[in-house]
Amino acid sequence: MSRYRGPRLKKIRRLGALPGLTNKSPRAIRDLRNNSRSEYRIRLEEKQKLRFHYGLTEKQLINYVQIARKAKGSTGKVLLQLLEMRLDNILFRLGMASTIXAARQLVNHRHVLVNGRLVNRPSYRCKPHDIIMPKNTTKSGVLVQNSLELFTGKELANHLNLFSTPYKGLVNKIVDTNWIGLKINELLVVEYYSRQA
């Protein structure tokens, strides 16, 4: 299954606010069909929220769930930590891109350096003490600067630091799952995939 490129507002109306997909918010509409939601539908919607927010394909999400199952700790929390430490998501959280899709494009077009090395994989897993900055070209700097001007006034994640003089971000530590700005029940996502197996 490929990455979703269709109308974003339809997904937001269906699943609720997804800040990684778009910065628009859904209208407050009462869903009359909510009363008859099955358990399967609830689990599926939680999985779809996660998938569309982070811009993943179904196969990528399955791979992340398998990695999270093998790791120590709660599978749901480890899954969210893995997704939050992706390079495209870190750029979005730092404010260097307005959405995760815009951050993915920055990385794919080779505008981002991690620890002084060019990285063009949006799924690159950042580690604590990684330094993320735009490439030393005017085009890269302008793209990041425009996004940061829109980001002013928003709260920065507690696991990240942003330095404005040469525009660089620092990953302090692994993300705390309580901070994630997405209303999601990660256990339902893990349950969805455990029932599929």
Swiss-Prot record:
One of its GO terms (cellular component) is plastid. Transmembrane segments: none annotated. GO terms for molecular function: rRNA binding; structural constituent of ribosome. The keyword Ribosomal protein applies. It is found in: Plastid. Keywords: Plastid, Ribonucleoprotein, Ribosomal protein, RNA-binding, rRNA-binding. Disulfide bonds: none annotated. Residues 85-161 form the S4 RNA-binding domain. GO terms for biological process: ribosomal small subunit biogenesis; translation. Gene3D superfamilies: Ribosomal Protein S4 Delta 41, Chain A, domain 1, RNA-binding S4 domain. Belongs to the universal ribosomal protein uS4 family. PANTHER family: 30S 40S RIBOSOMAL PROTEIN (PTHR11831), SMALL RIBOSOMAL SUBUNIT PROTEIN US4M (PTHR11831:SF4). Part of the 30S ribosomal subunit. Contacts protein S5. The interaction surface between S4 and S5 is involved in control of translational fidelity. This is Small ribosomal subunit protein uS4c. It comes from Cuscuta sandwichiana. The gene is rps4.
